């Protein structure tokens, strides 16, 4: 909506860079908060029990709400009767599905490493690097209409690769903060 002369100014380029940091910072913060929550509730990440089921159900609710807001109609029948292109729209990923999926990945990593903080931070870092590395490859893949939006930046605003990587980097940063904070911030 801005004139090209405005977009060519140096302050606009600075604004554009800062504006581009919003989504990664939001996902990074979600990962940071997830790790802090993990530290407080570590026991609930160790076993397949009621607490874990409640956590996963809450995360799946966030993912479901992300899909719900994309439905073109409130009628499932009308949605199903749309064309193949029309069906892809409800499956496009937005920030809610990205956060939910990232939290599911983080929860799975916590279960696999049995709640050990250092291992969880390392697993989060390596998985984040995997998400970043696979992004160009996954973006070029073509698959079924319901799978393609998971990885295609053309079909989704927030495909899983690379965006979940920012959440996992946030989790790693929270662990790192826990390691260095006592040194720099004496209580």
Language-model segments: residues:
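Hydrophobic alpha-helical segments with transmembrane-like composition
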Residues: 69-179
């Amino acid at each position: 909506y801005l004139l090209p002369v405005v977009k060519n100014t140096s302050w606009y380029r600075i604004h554009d860079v800062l504006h581009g940091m919003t989504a990664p910072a939001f996902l990074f913060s979600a990962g940071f908060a997830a790790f802090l929550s993990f530290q407080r509730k570590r026991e609930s990440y160790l076993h397949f029990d009621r607490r874990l089921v409640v956590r996963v159900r809450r995360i799946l609710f966030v993912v479901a709400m992300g899909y719900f807001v994309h439905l073109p109609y409130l009628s499932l029948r009308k949605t199903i009767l749309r064309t193949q292109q029309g069906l892809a729209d409800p499956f496009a990923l937005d920030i809610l599905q990205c956060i939910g999926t990232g939290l599911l990945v983080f929860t799975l990593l916590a279960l696999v490493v049995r709640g050990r903080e250092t291992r969880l931070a390392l697993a989060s870092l390596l998985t984040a690097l995997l998400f970043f590395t696979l992004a160009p490859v996954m973006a070029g893949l073509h698959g079924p209409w319901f799978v393609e939006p998971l990885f295609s930046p053309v079909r989704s605003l927030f495909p899983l690769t690379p965006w979940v990587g920012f959440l996992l980097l946030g989790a790693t940063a929270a662990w790192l903060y826990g390691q260095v904070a006592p040194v720099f911030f004496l209580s």
